[in-house]
Amino acid sequence: MNACHFSGWIPFAPETRYTPSGRKIICFAARVCDERGAESILRFQMDGDPVAPLPPELAPGRAVEIEAAATTQAVHRPDGRTVSRLVFHVTRLAASGRRQRRPGDSPLQLALF
């Protein structure tokens, strides 16, 4: 695993999934910016307490600092091809205030996990 650090903001609400064994997985996205100023949306996963509410740091519009471990995962497609996907597992999540909306930003964004 490779350790990564990201600064960004949460563009839309997270999604909660449960494994067959009952483990809670929180899937969320963050819009991050690289050193050249280019923005990307990255998807993250983190373990959650099965009975606890979602962390307030994951509220849409919240600025966050994320430390994650990156792993490569094989994905088998319906057409028979196997491709690799980079998966980020969160090791630390910290809020850093609210993001200031820029002119031209859409107030609604859709997440597909």
For each predicted feature, which ranges?
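Single-stranded nucleic acid-binding surfaces, predominantly the OB-fold ssDNA-binding core
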Residues: 1-113
